[in-house]
Structure formats: structure tokens, C-alpha cells
Amino acid sequence: MNKGKSMKIRTSIVKASYCSAFIVLLLSGCDSAEKAEQANSGLPSSIEARDAFVADIVAKHIYKAGETLPENPNGYPPYIYGTADLNNNGEDEILILMQNQDYCGSGGCTGFVFDNKKQQVAKFTVMDRPILLGNEVHLGWHDIIAYSDGAMHSLRYSADGYPLNTSTAPIFDYETKQKEAVGLAMNSEYYKDNGTNLVPAYQQKIFDCQSCYLFSYDYQDGSDKISYLEVNVDSKKVTPIEAIK
């Protein structure tokens, strides 16, 4: 073999080795990033894994042994959930709001908060959406702002934990900023040209921001399509929302 040919082969081997090493590092980096994300929140990072994590909590820690989740006649899922770092420890808690008749009454439904080790942190009665992450912190825990029995209430953490009955917690002034949110939505590019019948929609994701409001609206062209806008009053940002659960 001549020297030039030997050099080309050696160069090719080096390039191949470099590429292989780069791919390994890239995959390792992705895996590390995913693990870091899970470590940061303490919960599974993928939606599917997180759904399974919550389903296990419901099956083992909310429902009694042998019970199964019933079908809701209205088509709603038996529960919904959201996550947030309530106590600023770098790990997310999970709020699960039950939606079937076993856990719901005329004023609202039962909600539960669990940590990432599946330990129950709090239980709430007479709770419904919107359920927002409050800005204020008491004893290291964020307030939870939730609807109950015709009004929004501020659930504040105390030496005894969060209060059980949402409806007896202090009233939270939700309407003042909601009026400002209506103006921002109506003046947005998404609504003012072809929108009509703007109304509040309360299917916000659990632990949405305290200053966030959701609206639905129709189109003036007679289309059956219903669209949604989320308004953050503090940032003045209006965002179209594609799907609502």
C-alpha cells in the first residue's frame, strides 16, 4: 500500500471515529437534558410518562383498592391535573381535580395536591376551575386561587397546611383585572377584525398565572368554529389557544 493511500484510510478512520463520538455525545447530551429536566421538576418529563404517573396516584392514593374510574356521561375525563413548584424547592407538586359524580357537587369538585413522591400534601372540597398559581407566598408556599360556589377564593398555606373547604377561604378579586383583560382581547388582532360574542372561558390549565384570563369567541362570517384567547394582563400579551381540554 502506498503512503498516500494509507494516509487517506487513516484520515477516514479518524473522521468516522470523530463522527461516532459526536453522535454518542449528542445522544448522551439529549438523555442528560431529559434527566436534568426530570430532576429539576422531580416528575417525568414526557407527557405520556407524566400522565401515567398521575394515573397511578389516582388509582392507588385517591380511589380505594378495587375501584375503577367511571365513565363521565358528559364526556369529560374523570380528572384533570396541573403541576407547579408550590413551595419553591425546585420540585413540582401536582394538583389533581376530580371531575366525576363521586367527587363533585353543585358547588364544585374535590381536588388533591401530591408531591413527586406521591405523598398527599393537601385536599380541597368544593373546588372548580379556574385554578391559578398565586403570586403571594405564605410560610414558603404559593397561594392557590380557585373558583368555588360562585366566586374566586385565595387558598393560603398556614401552620395547618392549605384549607380544606375552598368556599370558606378569603375572596379573591378576580373581576377587576378581568375587565382589563376583556379590553385587551377585543383590541387584539385576533378578535377585532372578525370576532364576535367574546365571553369568559374557565377551562384554563391548572396553575395558569394569576393574571391570566381565558376567553372564547365566534366569527362574524358565520363559521361554527369557536376560538380561544388567553390574556396576560400584567404583560398585556394576547395569545390564541388552539385546543381546550
Across the structure, where does each feature detected by a protein language model lie?
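C-terminal motif of bacterial Sec signal peptides marking the signal peptidase cleavage site
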Residues: L27-G29
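Bacterial N-terminal signal peptides that target proteins for export
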Residues: K5-C19
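Short, solvent-exposed loop/turn segments at conserved positions within beta-propeller repeat blades
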Residues: C104-C109, S223
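Calcium-binding motifs, dominated by EF-hand helix-loop-helix domains
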Residues: G82-L86
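Acidic/hydrophobic-patterned starts of short beta strands in beta-sheet-rich repeat architectures
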Residues: N88-Q99, H138-A146
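Repeat-based blade/solenoid architectures
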Residues: G66-Y79, F124-G134
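Extracellular C-terminal loop/segment signatures of secreted glycoproteins
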Residues: T110-R129, L164-S167
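Acidic, small-residue rich beta-repeat scaffolds with periodic aromatic anchors
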Residues: D31-D56, L133-K245
